[in-house]
Amino acid sequence: MKKMLKVGQIVNTHGIKGELKVTSLSDYLERFEELEWVYIQGYDEKYYIGNIKYRPTTVILSFEGYDNINIVEQFKGKYVLIDESQRRELPEDTFYKADLIGLDGYTVEEVYLGKLVDIIQAGSNEVYVFRDKETNKDILIPAVKEFIPEISLEKKRITVDPIEGMIE
């Protein structure tokens, strides 16, 4: 089975001509223009992208051969997926969110914080949410170089350099 990556979630239909409203899971909204086809969660076939329109918070997609609301309604709530081979090459020190979720967080003093369970958008920065499985407590760390000096996918860990009071 190929490894698939989520690039969007179909939140609704748009109009009556088979268009779908998609919430992008990528920081790069124009990502869909680089794709010839995608998969839809729960379906094995490739869906070739027809038209793409942009709204402030969503992307409106249509697929070739799917020109009726009744045909595409079944896709509501499903994820738009790509094959791992379709990944974009990212700049150095930039990571896919899916690759970060599940990594272990440690302070620079080697104190275990927990696993990264979520990445939330807070203003202009993302915030990493680490969860300690023993206490079930969430620790929120701004995802900026000042507090996150190192991320190692190979070691499956994120190093955190918190200021006083940040993790208490």
Swiss-Prot record:
Summarize the protein's role. Answer: An accessory protein needed during the final step in the assembly of 30S ribosomal subunit, possibly for assembly of the head region. Essential for efficient processing of 16S rRNA. May be needed both before and after RbfA during the maturation of 16S rRNA. It has affinity for free ribosomal 30S subunits but not for 70S ribosomes.
UniProt family annotation = Belongs to the RimM family.
What is said about its interaction partners and assembly? Binds ribosomal protein uS19.
The PRC barrel domain is annotated at 92-166
Entry text on domains: The PRC barrel domain binds ribosomal protein uS19.
Q: Name one GO cellular component term.
A: ribosome
Q: Which organism is it from?
A: Alkaliphilus metalliredigens (strain QYMF)
Question: Where found in the cell?
Answer: Cytoplasm
Q: Organism's domain of life?
A: Bacteria
Single GO biological process annotation from the record: ribosomal small subunit biogenesis
PANTHER family from the xrefs?
RIBOSOME MATURATION FACTOR RIMM
Listed A to Z, the keywords are: Chaperone, Cytoplasm, Ribosome biogenesis, rRNA processing
Task: Please give the name of this protein.
Answer: Ribosome maturation factor RimM
Q: Which SUPFAM superfamilies match?
A: PRC-barrel domain (SSF50346), Translation proteins (SSF50447)
Q: What is its main location?
A: cytoplasm
Family annotation (InterPro entries) = PRC_barrel-like_sf, PRC_RimM, RimM, RimM_N, RimM_N_sf, Transl_B-barrel_sf
GO MF terms on file? ribosome binding
